[in-house]
Design a protein with these regions (language model features):
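Membrane-interface anchor segments at the N-terminal boundary of transmembrane helices
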Residues: 28-52, 164-177, 357-439, 464
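Perimembrane helix-loop-helix junctions
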Residues: 60, 64, 239-240, 267-301, ...
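Transmembrane-helix motifs of polytopic, lipid-linked glycan transferases
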Residues: 61, 167-192, 230
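Hydrophobic alpha-helical membrane-interfacial segments at the cytosolic entry of transmembrane helices
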Residues: 74-82, 252-253, 286-311, 330-336, ...
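Extracytosolic helix-loop segments that constitute the early lumenal/periplasmic catalytic or substrate-binding loops
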Residues: 88-139, 143, 153-156, 337
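Membrane-interface transmembrane helices that cradle and orient dolichyl/undecaprenyl
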Residues: 190-192, 231-246, 257
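Short acidic/glycine- and proline-prone juxtamembrane loop motifs at membrane-interface regions
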Residues: 210-224
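Membrane-lumen/periplasm interface segments of specific transmembrane helices
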Residues: 293-408, 509-510
């Protein structure tokens, strides 16, 4: 949207634009107090969503009529729609639905899933003792579980004695997911995109299906994503502005992120590149170079102990490898019989016939790494094939997402070819490094652990950042002549279509009732 000096600033959207974190936290707290993060029916949650959408759209029309729909106001409204979407999703999705390795919450049952991990820490105020390689999900670093345990401990002070509401944990999930979207947008802005592309990027990320799925998830993925984006943000700020505060905050976010999920450390490739570039630039000036070097020492001193103490503890006590990952024993998901060529290039009816995940129990397996990544990025592990409405909506959403991916891929090529034309030269290179290292890491992990569950978009959220930046690069292209904004308009339509279809899909998902699941004998 071009800058129009005749537009006036709206006070409400102005406050929301300046204080998104505090407003979001307040709203989540209100929802927690009012609902306990659960409603009696999916229909009630849908009513909340639809009323929220209508209110936001109505307010947007009012701002348009009164000439106060500034680009900033439009972005606020877009993010508000995303908040309402995720709120409704959480209210109709309980902690036993669309979860990954969560297990069942039951008092005194310290199962080897995330639920048992959280309850153990809550009840014992200590970490579980023992060889984590024999304790299921307990191999994960404990920061997320400590936060959840502390939250339950405090929240239960306000409940009648002896009662529990584990659904309340989704208040944290909802908070982390909304914060992640906000920080992701701030990352993209800090890297540098033009003003016209900002609402387009906001539409791409605010209703992103993977963020909606994570908003109801109680495992450690959500918090790790937030801390990863936060580490990138303050790392970028330090690269641009310097300052001990920025490097300390980046180190804390990286350290706590790795203490949530070790894979957060993968950002070291892209951030490390920027840190080295800054050191080389600043070393020309003796004092400035020394200051930058000491800043990096501070980063390492903070980040390394926070991020690695748990893995080192397990190695010293039980010889558990630092990069240990729990192996799946689900034979239905075993795809080791497929060749590397099949796993990279095999296309089996996708996207025409087969656009929901195949986990093997019905005799069909998703063995292609990138097809599985796309499916989980849109639908998680949900399968709505037996519902006509969900199938049609999901299929259209998939087709639009493929267009988004194509534009982002073209944007990466364009970014590389036009690096010297932008002030964000080094930042753009770091995005390319981030994208390449994420894809290589994903591929290596998939080959090392050849199970369908080893591939999920929630493991590759850095691609959301890279993809949005590259999409914005295409959106910002100006043509010559009277149609100079044509590409911006086309990419805007694509982003708007993705935004609308994602909202529709995850607004009506509550209506889906899973049919009888057919489980076949393994034939491979």
């Amino acid at each position: 949207m071009p800058n129009n000096p005749s537009l006036k600033q709206d006070k409400i959207t102005g406050v929301l634009y300046k204080h998104p974190f505090s407003v979001t936290a307040f709203l989540v707290l209100v929802v927690l107090i009012a609902t306990g993060m659960q409603l009696k029916s999916g229909a009630a949650a849908c009513v909340v969503q639809v009323c929220g959408y209508l209110l936001i759209i109505g307010y947007g029309i009012y701002l348009k009529q009164t000439k106060r729909l500034t680009p900033e106001a439009l972005i606020v409204l877009i993010f508000a729609m995303g908040f309402v979407l995720r709120l409704g999703y959480v209210l109709y999705t309980d902690i036993a639905t669309r979860q990954n390795d969560a297990g069942i919450f039951e008092e005194g049952n310290y199962n080897y899933f995330h639920s048992g991990y959280i309850l153990y820490i809550r009840d014992h105020l200590a970490l579980p003792a023992g060889d984590v390689s024999k304790m299921g999900e307990y191999y994960h670093p404990p920061f997320h579980h400590i936060v959840c345990a502390a939250f339950l401990k405090i929240y239960e002070l306000f409940l009648p004695k002896g009662t529990h509401n584990y659904e309340s944990l989704q208040a944290l999930s909802l908070l982390w997911a909304n914060f992640s979207v906000i920080v992701l947008y701030k990352d993209i802005k800090l890297i540098g995109i033009n003003r016209e592309s900002c609402p387009i990027v906001a539409a791409l990320i605010s209703a992103a299906p993977i963020c909606t799925i994570l908003s109801g998830s109680i495992n450690n993925d959500n918090l790790s994503v937030l801390l990863m984006f936060t580490a990138i943000y303050f790392g970028l700020k330090w690269f641009k502005e310097g300052g001990i505060r920025n490097i300390v905050l980046s180190a804390l976010a990286t350290g706590f992120g790795m203490m949530t999920k070790l894979a957060v450390g993968l950002i070291a490739f892209s951030l490390g590149f920027l840190f080295i570039v800054k050191l080389i630039k600043d070393i020309r000036g003796r004092k400035e170079g020394l200051r930058t070097f000491l800043n990096l020492v501070v980063f390492g001193v903070i980040c390394a102990p926070l991020g690695l103490w748990f893995e080192i503890r397990n190695y010293l006590n039980y010889k558990v490898p630092v990069t240990y990952v729990l192996l799946s024993d689900n034979i239905y998901q075993d795809v080791s019989r497929y060749t590397p060529a099949q796993r990279l290039f095999g296309f089996y009816g996708f996207p025409i016939e087969d656009y929901y995940i195949n986990l093997g129990s019905d005799g069909q397996q998703d063995y292609n790494i990138f097809i599985t990544l796309i499916k989980t990025g849109l639908f998680g592990e949900e399968n709505c094939r037996d519902d006509f409405l969900m199938s049609i909506t999901g299929y259209i959403l998939l087709l639009i997402f493929l267009v988004v991916i194509a534009v982002a891929a073209a944007g990466m090529i364009y970014t590389v070819l036009t690096l010297k034309k932008r002030d964000s030269f080094w930042e753009d290179i770091s995005m390319v490094i981030m994208c390449v290292t994420q894809i290589i890491s994903l591929t290596m992990f998939a080959f090392k652990y050849p199970h369908i569950c080893s591939i999920h978009f929630r493991f590759t959220m850095m691609l959301a950042l890279c993809g949005a930046v590259f999409f914005a690069r295409i959106s910002g292209i100006k043509l010559k002549g009277s149609n100079k904004d044509l590409i911006t308009k086309i990419t805007g339509v694509i982003a708007a279509a993705f935004f609308i279809l994602a909202i529709i899909f995850y607004t009506i998902l509550w209506t889906y009732v899973k049919g009888e699941v057919t489980v076949v004998d393994v034939t491979w």
